[in-house]
Amino acid sequence: MNQQSTKTSDLIKAIIKKGTLKQEVYHKTLDIFNEFKSQSKTLVENNKEIVKKAKFPLLFEFSNHSAFEFQLKFGSDILIFFMHSNIFELPRDHEVMKTPYIKDDKTRSYGGLIHIFNFLADSFRYNRTNDLGYLIGRIFVNRELHYFIEGKREIGLLYNNFSYARLNQKTIKSILHSAILYTLNFDLLTPPFDNMKEVTVQEMQTTLDAMSIRTGKRLGFRFQADQVEE
């Protein structure tokens, strides 16, 4: 075999190796995403009759939108679960890259991503396209089903042991419940007065549902409208 043939052979081997790795990670991530989807659907089916007995009508629905997206609606909130179709490698400066788990096998640093977004249900119901949503959790899954979550508060703190933590039905249920509880406790706060005090005639003439005044949950704000600078 001449030198050119050897280079071509090495190239094909590299293509097969990297492609096979990414396909393995992709299918493992899709399996995990489908388990999230299945458990969300089951949660609604098993409890919707109980929710119907509440004093007022409450939103409690599951809806499948595609192979890579589903929505879980409850109360005034929506959780959107979205799986990215591509596979990613962790950045070299990421803390996980310093662990023996990754140093022993670099292919473990490749993973799929599952995003969990929180939106207000009314934002979709009334087509308020300027409303804000928040990424409350991002799940990184590798080919061995090891995972960690980058997320808000307890979501990110509870699930960040990548070297040892593996996804299964039990951990998926725990993550799902944590995401719902976090959303329930992440309340809508009154927007800062300075952001609201000036409104155009056009905005006032438009229906309230279509106004370009954003509505979204806030992590908090300082009341500054009446403060005088010293």
Description of each model-found segment:
Residues 14, 18, 43, 175-178, ...:
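Residues that form generic nucleotide/phosphate-binding pockets
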Residues 1-22:
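N-terminal, Lys/Arg- and Ser/Thr-rich interaction peptides
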Residues 57, 61-145, 150-157:
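Hydrophobic-cavity lipid-handling domains and compact docking modules
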Residues 24, 28-71:
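Short N-terminal edge-element motif at the start of the domain
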Residues 45-56, 82-83, 90-92, 188-192:
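Short, solvent-exposed secondary-structure capping/transition elements
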Residues 137-230:
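Glycine-rich, aromatic-bearing surface loops/beta-hairpins
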Residues 19, 23-34, 158-169:
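Short, charged/polar micro-motifs that form catalytic or ligand-binding hotspots
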Residues 8-15, 47, 179, 204, ...:
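Generic structural signal of hydrophobic/aromatic residues within well-ordered alpha-helices
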